[in-house]
Amino acid sequence: MQSHPEVAVLRYGHRPGRDDRMTTHVGLTARALGADRVLFPDNATQAAETVRDITGRFGGPFDVERTTELNATIEDWPGVVVHLTMYGEQLQSVDDEIRTTHREEPVLVVVGGEKVPGDVYEAADWNVGVTNQPHSEVAGLAVFLDRLFDGRELEQGYENAERRVIPEELGKHVVDVEDGDHAEGAAAGDGD
């Protein structure tokens, strides 16, 4: 969310073929829930393309980057590093402190994709567990960002969108922004 110091999400690790959907969803969740950018491992080409495409169609601002320097990204981060792991401190015991720190400093949220080395745990300012139970890293990211932004991310607008979803009780309603009266809809339960 552009009114605060930056929030970036680093996907730490990606196994092509196995993690494609999950890595893509890390990026989509970061975008939808207020982060300013996502950094993917260099081999996450398809995930990066998909998130860029969604950002182009549904608006931003949101940046997508790929890097071969995952550890250097963490080590050189100019603010605080939050590593999401089920083994970390309970979110509810540290979220106020992280939120307060974020008022002054950018936050890098590290989301593991495969076994995360101990160096990441040591480099993080906080190792945070959303439930301390096995769960999806996408779910953990969503809950963390909602706590970080205190729900404000749910009201954010998106600039330069080509398409916009019109909320409805039933069905799907998507309009082209240039032609607001042209809607594409489908009955509830059709497709995604």
Curated annotation (Swiss-Prot):
Protein origin, superkingdom: Archaea
Gene3D superfamilies: 3.40.1280.10
Key word Nucleotidyltransferase present: no
Keywords, ordered alphabetically: Cytoplasm, Methyltransferase, S-adenosyl-L-methionine, Transferase, tRNA processing
Single Gene Ontology BP annotation: tRNA nucleoside ribose methylation
Gene Ontology CC annotations of this record: cytoplasm
Positions of S-adenosyl-L-methionine binding: L84, G112, G113, E114, K115, V116
EC supergroup of this enzyme: transferase
GO terms assigned for molecular function: tRNA (cytidine(56)-2'-O)-methyltransferase activity
One matching Pfam family: Trm56
EC number of the protein: 2.1.1.206
Reaction(s) the record says it catalyses: cytidine(56) in tRNA + S-adenosyl-L-methionine = 2'-O-methylcytidine(56) in tRNA + S-adenosyl-L-homocysteine + H(+)
Subunit structure: Homodimer.
Purpose: Specifically catalyzes the AdoMet-dependent 2'-O-ribose methylation of cytidine at position 56 in tRNAs.
Protein name: tRNA (cytidine(56)-2'-O)-methyltransferase
Organism: Halobacterium salinarum (strain ATCC 700922 / JCM 11081 / NRC-1)
